[in-house]
Amino acid sequence: MDRITDFYFLDFRESVKTLIITGNSWRLQEMIDRFFTNISNFNRESLTEIQNIQIEEIAVNLWNWAVTKRVELSVRKNQAAKLCYIACKLVYMHGISVSSEEAIQRQILMNIKTGKEWLYTGNAQIADEFFQAAMTDLERLYVRLMQSCYTEANVCVYKMIVEKGIFHVLSYQAESAVAQGDFKKASMCVLRCKDMLMRLPNMTKYLHVLCYNLGIEASKRNKYKESSFWLGQSYEIGKMDRRSVEPQMLAKTLRLLATIYLNCGGEAYYTKAFIAILIANKEHLHPAGLFLKMRILMKGNSCNEELLEAAKEILYLAMPLEFYLSIIQFLIDNKRESVGFRFLRIISDNFKSPEDRKRILLFYIDTLLQKDQDMIAEEKIKDVLKGYQTRSRLSRDLVNWLHNILWGKASRSVKVQKYADALHWYSYSLKLYEYDKADLDLIKLKRNMVSCYLSLKQLDKAKEAIAEVEQKDPTHVFTRYYIFKIAIMEGDAFRALQVVSALKKSLMDGESEDRGLIEAGVSTLTILSLSIDFALENGQQFVAERALEYLCQLSKDPKEVLGGLKCLMRIILPQAFHMPESEYKKKEMGRLWNYLNTALLKFSEYFNEAPSTLDYMVNDANWFRKIAWNLAVQSEKDLEAMKNFFMVSYKLSLFCPLDQGLLIAQKTCLLVAAAVDLDRGRKAPTICEQNMLLRTALEQIKKCKKVWNLLKKTGDFSGDDCGVLLLLYEFEVKTKTNDPSLSRFVDSVWKMPDLECRTLETMALLAMDKPAYYPTIAHKAMKKLLLMYRKQEPVDVLKYSVCMHNLIKLLVADEVWNISLYPLKEVQSHFKNTLSIIRQNEGYPEEEIVWLMIKSWNIGILMSSKNKYISAERWAAMALDFLGHLSTLKTSYEAKVNLLYANLMEILDKKTDLRSTEMTEQLRALIVPPEDQGSVSSTNVAAQNHL
C-alpha cells in the first residue's frame, strides 16, 4: 500500500511540474480537481521514499504558481482555493520539521491566505479550519520568539508582530462567522479586535470599515438589530482615531444607523434615530442628513414648526432649487401641505432669477392640481399662457414640464372617468402648442383627446381629430385603435376589419414597437386584445372572431392564446349547437376542432415550463376537455367527427389531475374512438386503408386497457362491459390484420376464468368474418360455448341450436364429397348431445331438427358410398331419431324419409359394389338437399350489431 501511495505521489509531483512549466493546460481544471481529491490519501508515514525537503519544495512551488498566475491564467476562485489547500496540506504533513521562525510565519501566511480564498468562494467552514490553524501557528511563533529574544526591545517588537497577526485572523473569523449566521461569535471576535486597537492604532480604519460593511450586509438581510450593532461599533471605532477616519465617513455611518433605527419602528428606536442623526449632522452637515432628520421628525409626528425649522436649516447649504422643491414635495406627499407651502414662499425669496421664479410657479401649479385646488391653479395657468404669449417666454424644458403637468391632471381625470375635465386640461396644452408652434407631442395630445371624445360618444369631434392624426402618424398602434373604435361605433365592419388586418400585418412583418409603449406595457398584441373586447362589447362578433384568430395565431403568450381560443369557442358554440345538419355546420365544427388542437399544442409546449402557471393551465385544460366531449356528443351523426372530438378530449385530459371521473371519461373517449375506427375499417374500400384504420384502433385499445386497469383500482366496476369490449375489439383487429401475436392473445383468452357466452359467440363470428379466416378459433369457441349452454339450468335451446348449427356447418361442408375431410366422430358426438338436449328440453326449433336430420342422412349416404355399411346404417338411424322428435313438420318428412331409409337398406342388403357408376347414381339420388332454414345473420352484421 505504501508503494502505491509513493507511486501516486510521484505522479502528483510530475503533474505539478508539468502544470508549472506548461502554464494554462487545457486539462487545468481536471488536474486541480484530481489533486484536491487525492491529497487526503497522502500522509508522511506512507511517503517512505520522499524527503521532507522535496515535499516542501513542491508545496512552495505550487503555492507561488497559484498566487502569481491566478489572474494571468484566469484560474477561477474555487480552483485557486483548492491549489492553496493542497499546498498547505503538503506543508503540514506529519514529520516535516519547522526549523525557523520564518518557516512558521510562512505557514501562518499560507493559512490566512487559504482561509480567505475559501471564505470568498462561499465555503466558510473550510475557511475556519485554516484560520484556526493560523491562530495555533501564531501561538507557536510567540513561544519560539520569546525563547530566542534577549532584550526588552525585541520582546515588544515580537509581541507586536504576533498581535497584528492575531488581529487579522480574528477579523477574518468574524467575517466567516457572519457568513455562517453566528452573530455571537462574530461580535466576540470584533470586540477582541477593538480591545487591541490601543496597541494597534493604525488598524482603526480597517476595523471601522469592516464593521460598516457588516452592518450594510445585515441590513440587506433585514437583520436590523445586528446591523445597528455593527454600525454602532463602526462609529465608536472610528472615533478612536479621528486622524485616520474622516468626519464624512463617521457621519455616513451614523446616517445609515439612524435609517436602521427608523426601520425598526417603535418610540425607543425613534429616539435613537433622532439622536444618531443629530450627532451625524454635528460630525458633518450634509443634505442627506438634514433630509433624514425631517423624515425622522415626520415619523415622530412632530409639529409643523419643528418641521419648518428643520427645512430652514437646509437653506444654509445653498443647494440647487430642485433639491428644495423635492423637500417641499416630500412634505406635501406626507400631508404637511401648510409647511410645504410656507417653505415654498421662503425659497421663492431666496431664488430671484426669472428662470427659477418660473420653475417655482410651475411647481406651485402642479402642487395645486395634485391637491385638487383647480380654480387657483387654472388662474396661474392662464397667467403663464398670457405671459408666454406676450413677453415672458418659457424655456423648452419648462414648456415640456407644463405639458406634463397638464397631461398628468388630465390623466387623473380620465382615471375617475371625468372625460370632459380631461378635455378641459388638454385644451390648455393645445393652446400652449399653438403659441409655441412646436410639434413635439401634438399628435399624442390629439390621440388622447380622441380617446376622451369617444368615451363621451362625441363621434364627430373624434373623427375630426383622428383625421389630423391619421395624416401625420397613420401607422401608430393607437391611431389604428381609435380608427377601429370609431368604425365599430358606426357599425362599419369592413373598416374595422381593415384595421385588424393592418395590426396583423405589422405583427407578422416584425415592425419595431414604440419604446415608450413597450415600457408602459403596451404592444400591438395588447391593442389587438383591446380591439377584440371593444368589438364584443358592441355586438360585432364577426370582427371579434377574425381578431381573435389573429391573436391566437401570433401571440407567444400561452395564457393569452388559451384565453383567445376560449373566447372564440364561446362565440361559435351556441351557434353551432343550434344549426341544422348541413355543410356549413360541418365547416363550423371543423373550425372548433382546429381550435381545440391549437389549445392542445399550447398545453404540450408550455405545460411544464413554469410551476407558477400550473393552476390556470390545469383549469383551462379541464375546460377545453369538457368542450371537446360535448362536441363529440353533438356529432353522433358524423362518426369520424365524433371520434376526432373524443380523441382531443382524451389528449387534453392528460393535462388534468387524475381521479375516478377523469378515468371514466378517458375510458369512454378511447373506447368510442376504437369502435369508430373498427367500423370504418370494416367498410374501407381498400386493404391498405383497412389496415391503417385497424392499427389506429389497436393503439387506442392498448391505451384504453391501461386506463381501464387504473379505473378498476378505484372502485367496483363489475357491471361495466369495457373489459369485454376491449377484448373483442382487440381480437377483431388481430384477426383481420393477421397479427402474429394472435396465437398468444387467444391462448390468454382461453385461460380467462370468467368468459361469458356472448363473448364466445362474438369471437366465433369474428374469427370467420372476412378478411379473417380462423376456423380453429371459431371451432374452439363454439365447443366452449356449447359446453356452457349444456351446464345452464334450464338450457337455452334457441341459443344452443344456433351454435350447434354453426359448428356443424363449420365441420361438415355441404359441397365436399370426401369423408376423410370430416371429423365424423366429433360430429357424431355433437349429434348425440343434441338428441339428448332435445329429449330433455322442450322448444328446440323444428327447422334445426330438420336440418340436423338431413345433415345426418346425407352423411349416412356419404358413408355408404365409401362401403362403410355399419356407419351408414348408424347415421341413417340417427336421422330417423331426429325425425321422431318432429311435431308439426313430421308429416311432411316422415313418408319421404322412411321410403329413403327402406331404399338405402335394400341397397345395403344387396352388398353390391357401391363404387360402380350405377350404384353411385342411386346413392346420389338418396341425398336430401339441405334446407338451411335455421341459418344465422352474417358475422359482419353481428359484429356491427354488437358495437
From Swiss-Prot:
Keywords: Chromosome, Meiosis
GO terms for biological process, alphabetical: apoptotic process; chiasma assembly; ectopic germ cell programmed cell death; fertilization; male gonad development; male meiosis chromosome segregation; male meiotic nuclear division; meiotic gene conversion
InterPro entries registered for this protein in UniProt: Spo22/ZIP4/TEX11 (IPR013940), TEX11 (IPR042861), TPR-like_helical_dom_sf (IPR011990)
Subunit note: Interacts with SYCP2. Interacts with PBXIP1; may prevent interaction between PBXIP1 and ESR2. Interacts with SHOC1. Interacts with REDIC1.
Expression (tissue specificity): Testis-specific.
One GO CC term, this protein: chromosome
General function of this protein: Regulator of crossing-over during meiosis. Involved in initiation and/or maintenance of chromosome synapsis and formation of crossovers.
Gene knockout outcome: Defects in meiotic double-strand breaks (DSBs) repair and reduced crossover formation. However, discrepancies exist between the different reports. According to a report, deletion induces male sterility. Females are fertile with reduced litter. Adult mice show an arrest in male meiosis and aberrant chromosome segregation in anaphase spermatocytes. Chromosomal asynapsis and reduced crossover formation are observed, leading to elimination of spermatocytes at the pachytene and anaphase I stages.
Protein name stated in the entry: Testis-expressed protein 11
Record localization: Chromosome
Family under the similarity heading: Belongs to the SPO22 family.
Extra remark: Represent the only meiosis-specific factor encoded by the chromosome X in mouse.
Family annotation (PANTHER family): TESTIS-EXPRESSED PROTEIN 11 (PTHR47083:SF1)
Superkingdom, natural source: Eukaryota
